[in-house]
């Protein structure tokens, strides 16, 4: 799996590639990440990759020609199979479903915009997919690219110490995750300071039932849209529906 990142700030990626549980995948080449400095593809003495927008207005627009030279270099080295992904608030929301699809593919070319944006002609010619990290504005596409790299890499075989870890993540089954507890068993005298007794019981079926109940309760309270989506996908059992009907939210 290979990711080629087109960016004006490759140095933002270096610490990420050498830290955390995903580091093993990057350093071994299991997930190969190539960083491409867009200024290397500017042809003037000033390494200019942006200019003023036609029609006026604030800010600068990233130019088509340096981007196309960079993309040609990527395709010459990596081939044409990987989709070109542009990060923008206008894109489709990044979801765990899309992350899983990308994790099963060959990789992608990640385009990190800056300034007021990228000349639409480059987007129209070359971009295969646009993805948004959320309904807010960032200074560039580097943070969404880092988020996608992390999300995809942790799904690769052997990256996490426990292969079951990502199977219990939020969104792995369309719902939010349940609460987690560790030692000590009690932090204080209040009931909320104690680990729920069911988790100490050693009864696996009861633990699984409690976790599912918590997932449903938290998701219904905080993200009811995910409950609707799970229901539409047929992912809720009759027992799930009975529990949801009994909740006092």
UniProtKB/Swiss-Prot annotation:
GO biological process: tRNA N1-guanine methylation
UniProt cross-references to Pfam families, sorted A to Z: tRNA_m1G_MT (PF01746)
UniProt cross-references to SUPFAM superfamilies, sorted A to Z: alpha/beta knot
UniProt entry tagged with the keyword Manganese: no
Enzyme class: transferase
Catalysed reactions, as listed in the record: guanosine(37) in tRNA + S-adenosyl-L-methionine = N(1)-methylguanosine(37) in tRNA + S-adenosyl-L-homocysteine + H(+)
EC number: 2.1.1.228
Keyword vocabulary terms for this entry: Cytoplasm, Methyltransferase, S-adenosyl-L-methionine, Transferase, tRNA processing
Localization terms from the record: Cytoplasm
Gene Ontology CC terms: cytosol
Family: Belongs to the RNA methyltransferase TrmD family.
Assembly mode: Homodimer.
Function: Specifically methylates guanosine-37 in various tRNAs.
NCBIfam families: PRK00026.1, trmD
Name of the protein this chain belongs to: tRNA (guanine-N(1)-)-methyltransferase
Organism: Leptothrix cholodnii (strain ATCC 51168 / LMG 8142 / SP-6)
Lineage summary: Bacteria, Pseudomonadati, Pseudomonadota, Betaproteobacteria, Burkholderiales
């Amino acid at each position: 799996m290979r990711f080629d990142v087109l960016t004006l700030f490759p140095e933002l990626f270096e610490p990420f590639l050498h830290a955390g549980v995903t580091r093993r995948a990057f350093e071994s080449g299991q997930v190969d990440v190539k960083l491409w400095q867009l200024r290397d593809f500017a042809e003037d003495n000033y390494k200019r990759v942006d200019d003023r927008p036609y029609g006026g207005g604030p800010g600068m627009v990233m130019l088509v020609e340096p981007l196309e030279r960079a993309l040609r270099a990527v395709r010459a080295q990596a081939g044409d199979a990987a989709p070109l992904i542009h990060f923008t608030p206008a894109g489709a929301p990044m979801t765990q479903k899309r992350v899983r699809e990308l994790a099963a593919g060959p990789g992608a070319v990640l385009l990190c915009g800056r300034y007021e944006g990228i000349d639409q002609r480059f987007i129209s010619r070359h971009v295969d997919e646009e993805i948004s990290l959320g309904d807010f504005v960032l200074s560039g596409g580097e943070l969404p690219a880092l988020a996608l790299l992390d999300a995809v890499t942790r799904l690769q075989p052997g990256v996490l110490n426990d292969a079951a870890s990502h199977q219990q993540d939020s969104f792995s089954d369309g719902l939010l995750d349940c609460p987690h507890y560790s030692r000590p068993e009690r932090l204080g005298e209040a009931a909320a300071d104690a680990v729920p007794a069911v988790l100490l019981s050693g009864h696996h079926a009861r633990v699984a039932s409690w976790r599912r109940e918590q997932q449903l309760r938290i998701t219904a309270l905080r993200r009811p849209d995910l409950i609707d989506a799970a229901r539409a996908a047929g992912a809720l059992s009759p027992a799930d529906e009975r529990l949801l009907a009994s909740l006092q939210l």
